[in-house]
Amino acid sequence: MPELPEVETVRRGLEPAMAGRLIAEARVNRADLRWPFPPRMAERLTGQRVLRLRRRSKYILADLSGGQSLLIHLGMSGRMLVSGAQLGEFFHGHPAPSRHDHVVLEMEGGARITFNDARRFGAMDLVATEAAEAHPLLAVLGPEPLGNAFDGAYLAARLEGRRTPIKAALLDQRIVAGLGNIYVCEVLFRAGLAPGRLAGSLSRAEAEGLVPLIREVLLEAIEAGGSSLRDYRQADGELGYFQHTFRVYGREGLPCVTPGCSGTVGRIVQSGRSSFHCPLCQR
């Protein structure tokens, strides 16, 4: 599933084609994805101007001139693809099978935005812009990890006394929004913390020290265009590149990259997810 860096990369890729532009025509090719589309969605989108594109956790919101926002969740395999206009040097057209094109937005200026989702775990909804934060998918989310509300004091307070593994705590979207399996593995490696260690056992310094590392990993991943492991592509069809710099994720059996460490990257399963770590470096 695309995590925060991938969703932010897609948002940035959509901006040149969508922000400030009119939706000349919207087409909806099926009744639902993970959930039913809102009634008359194509009709309600057609003629609307996209005022801005923003991201909340792993969701993209397109604020529209009529006072509503189009909420987009990519799910497991969803892609927002830009085609029909040469918008940049790295434009790659439409690489996905068209039979999975579920929503198409013909934009003012000639660009076509296609929501392509082979597995159909994605979602789109329309919500009043002023009430967007109250949407059931957004209302339960914690602070953004790149925002000012997420700081060392906040995280230390949320982890204090918790008897869940630190990895599970960081994946809890109520504590911090947008983190997923890949980036939590990478953060914990840089922090020297074992994924199975209880969150409440961290010292205040250890808890506070996670915040700059979370930001560091996320910003590096955004700069690299995210991580392409299975279905993820940027809006122009380009692959992300952060997977080439993974230090532990997906490296089971390979040597630890820490200078002087003789350890080997291991894998354990926590709540059905693979956790990659160095048993020597991470305590």
Curated annotation (Swiss-Prot):
PROSITE patterns: FPG_CAT (PS51068), ZF_FPG_2 (PS51066). A zinc finger (FPG-type) spans 247-283. One of its GO terms (molecular function) is zinc ion binding. The keyword Hydrolase applies. The keyword DNA repair applies. Binds 1 zinc ion per subunit. Keywords: DNA damage, DNA repair, DNA-binding, Glycosidase, Hydrolase, Lyase, Metal-binding, Multifunctional enzyme, Zinc, Zinc-finger. SUPFAM superfamilies: Glucocorticoid receptor-like (DNA-binding domain) (SSF57716), N-terminal domain of MutM-like DNA repair proteins (SSF81624), S13-like H2TH domain (SSF46946). The active site is at residues 2-3, 58, 273. It catalyses: Hydrolysis of DNA containing ring-opened 7-methylguanine residues, releasing 2,6-diamino-4-hydroxy-5-(N-methyl)formamidopyrimidine; 2'-deoxyribonucleotide-(2'-deoxyribose 5'-phosphate)-2'-deoxyribonucleotide-DNA = a 3'-end 2'-deoxyribonucleotide-(2,3-dehydro-2,3-deoxyribose 5'-phosphate)-DNA + a 5'-end 5'-phospho-2'-deoxyribonucleoside-DNA + H(+). Its EC number is 3.2.2.23, 4.2.99.18. Its cofactor is Zn(2+). GO terms for biological process: base-excision repair. DNA binds at residues 100, 119, 162. Involved in base excision repair of DNA damaged by oxidation or by mutagenic agents. Acts as a DNA glycosylase that recognizes and removes damaged bases. Has a preference for oxidized purines, such as 7,8-dihydro-8-oxoguanine (8-oxoG). Has AP (apurinic/apyrimidinic) lyase activity and introduces nicks in the DNA strand. Cleaves the DNA backbone by beta-delta elimination to generate a single-strand break at the site of the removed base with both 3'- and 5'-phosphates. Belongs to the FPG family. Monomer. This is Formamidopyrimidine-DNA glycosylase. It comes from Cereibacter sphaeroides (strain ATCC 17029 / ATH 2.4.9) (Rhodobacter sphaeroides).
